[in-house]
UniProtKB/Swiss-Prot annotation:
It is found in: Cytoplasm. It comes from the Bacteria. GO terms for biological process: fatty acid biosynthetic process; malonyl-CoA biosynthetic process. Keywords: ATP-binding, Cytoplasm, Fatty acid biosynthesis, Fatty acid metabolism, Lipid biosynthesis, Lipid metabolism, Nucleotide-binding, Transferase. The gene is accD. InterPro entries: AcCoA_carboxyl_beta, Acetyl_CoA_COase_Trfase_b_su, ClpP/crotonase-like_dom_sf, COA_CT_N. It comes from Bartonella henselae (strain ATCC 49882 / DSM 28221 / CCUG 30454 / Houston 1) (Rochalimaea henselae). Its EC number is 2.1.3.15. Acetyl-CoA carboxylase is a heterohexamer composed of biotin carboxyl carrier protein (AccB), biotin carboxylase (AccC) and two subunits each of ACCase subunit alpha (AccA) and ACCase subunit beta (AccD). This is Acetyl-coenzyme A carboxylase carboxyl transferase subunit beta. The keyword Disulfide bond does not apply. Pfam families: Carboxyl_trans. Belongs to the AccD/PCCB family.
């Protein structure tokens, strides 16, 4: 046995050898190809600094950036029956759920919490697209209803961030039932005369668009978000016509009166806080910590004048 071969060489190789580098250290901007360091992106709420492109953001990160000082109290989601239909396609549905829960550390795609934004108490509900495409199922339906019930009980407004591909096909009719159930919860909030603001993020489609995502008092969209019922490719194949440029984008919907405003994620908190002060008749803040963009200020000034 040669001690150089068995001992020295492995030591040298361990020091000089190639080390595994995590794949997610640098994030590529889909629009420009620019590489952005993941820590810089996280600090900037996953908005590319140079282009303003809005990357997808996890529900936990969104709540942390949205609430004052990142402090909030999560609402416990109700427990539901798992996979009552015993659904299976290429993989058992129950196994898919286990995989997503293990990977993301959440039970389903809805996270709700109570906290404050610029001192205003609110309930916020966020859909996480990373969990089965943000699909609406029994668990997410129950979680949304729980958030509305909590807002009513605590007499505070509710802000919902939608991100979904639609109803969860693995739950069939049980998934579709969540559309009218969440609609009833919204009506109860409105009867209590409490504001309901929806923030449409990329993408918001399918049954979610056909229910709670388009029933808010005010609809705000993030820049470049795709919002619609069916996807543009399906529509184009059905009507056999070329769709307008930018069809179903948040900017297109704003231009055609489908939503109220398009606001950068970086200005979302300040914009929503100002809207809630108008709607709840709270006194204005003289010097808010964040400033809104010129477009947002103009839109809100019109609302105040009205």
């Amino acid at each position: 046995m040669n001690w150089i071969t068995n001992y020295v060489r492995p030591k040298i190789n361990s020091i000089l050898g190639r080390r595994e580098i995590p794949e997610n250290l640098w994030i590529k901007d889909p629009t420009s190809g620019e590489m952005v360091f993941h820590k810089d992106l996280e600090v900037n709420q996953y908005v590319i600094p140079s282009s303003g492109y809005h990357m997808r953001i996890s529900a936990k990160n969104r709540l942390t950036h949205f609430f004052d000082d990142g402090v909030y109290t999560p609402l416990e989601n109700p427990k539901v029956v798992i996979d009552p239909l015993k659904f299976r396609d290429e993989k058992r549905y129950i196994d898919r759920l286990k995989d997503y829960r293990s990977k993301l550390g959440i039970d389903d795609n809805i996270l709700s919490a109570r906290g404050t934004i610029e001192g205003l108490p609110i309930i916020a509900t966020v859909q996480d697209f990373a969990f089965m495409g943000g699909s609406l199922g029994m668990a997410s339906g129950e979680a949304i209803i729980k958030a509305f019930d909590t807002a009513i009980a605590e007499k505070c407004p509710l802000v919902l961030f939608s991100a979904s591909g639609g109803a969860r096909m693995q739950e069939g009719t049980l998934s579709l039932m969540q559309m009218p159930r969440t609609t009833v919860a919204i009506e109860m909030l409105k009867e209590a005369k409490l504001p309901y603001i929806v923030v449409l993020t990329n993408p918001t489609t399918g049954g979610v668009t056909a229910s709670y995502a388009m029933l808010g008092d005010i609809h705000i969209a993030e820049p470049g978000a795709m919002i619609g019922f069916a996807g543009p490719r399906v529509i184009q194949q059905t009507i056999r016509e070329t769709l307008p440029e930018g069809f179903q984008s948040s900017e297109y919907l704003l231009k055609h009166g489908m939503i109220d405003m398009v606001v950068s994620r970086l200005e979302m908190k300040t914009t929503i806080a100002r809207l809630l002060r108008l709607m709840m008749k709270y006194p204005p803040v003289v010097n808010p910590s964040n400033t809104s963009s010129t477009n947002s200020q103009a839109s809100l000034s019109k609302a105040e004048a009205a």
